[in-house]
Amino acid sequence: MKELICAFAVVATITSALAQGDVVYDNSSDPVLGTFVPEDTSLEFGDQISLSGDASIVTEFRLEYFSSDAAGTGVIRFRANDGAVDLQGGFETGQLEPSTVLYESASFPLQADFNTLEITGLSVPVPSDMFTFTIEFSDVPNTQNVGLLLRNPPVVGSSFDGVWVRPDNGDWALRQIPLTTANLAAQVVAVPEPGTVALALIGIGSLFGFMRRRR
């Protein structure tokens, strides 16, 4: 009986820990290196990141931005990097452009000053532990300063040192930011795939079964 109670306690603890998720990407540490937004603030742009660890179902996402005024809106998207090979000056860079939309948020109002946008309750599978998160601003007045914060380096995971920007023609392009590293401030929390959790629980069950037989 004691062994059964112990087994349930271990399973409950592990299941609870897995449900809470792990920080698989974190670029939220000081210093702040500035902000970035394309000259045309209506263009979609974002950062390509790689997640750390085995958890690949995104459950939480945080993004830092600045806005001088409480006006305009934004939309967050997660895109798989499964598009065409990026070209610069007619030569292939070897990087695949963002394409397939994995997630799109509802439109949210921009708030004045420095802000952290927090999105929770997600369940977004990420292919190959890598994706590009983007933002698209709308209805931003010409007099308004708005942009995403730049930080470096990420303390968990890694980020491609460039920003993807989608011009009006729809062809994505990589842009570098002079005198700084183009890593947008963000944090990602994820949980393992259900199959991984199931295998872990099966392994625990087998271990307790073996221990009972030994007794």
Residue ranges and their predicted role:
Residues 56-68:
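A short beta-strand element within beta-rich, extracytoplasmic domains
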Residues 208-215:
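C-terminal membrane-anchoring or membrane-association module
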Residues 18-38:
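Boundary/junction segments of secreted and surface-exposed precursor proteins
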Residues 31-43, 108-112:
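Extracellular beta-rich ligand/substrate-recognition surface
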Residues 21, 152-191:
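PGST-rich, cysteine-poor low-complexity/disordered linker and tail segments that act as flexible spacers
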Residues 39-52, 117:
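Short beta-strands within extracellular/lumenal beta-sheet-rich domains
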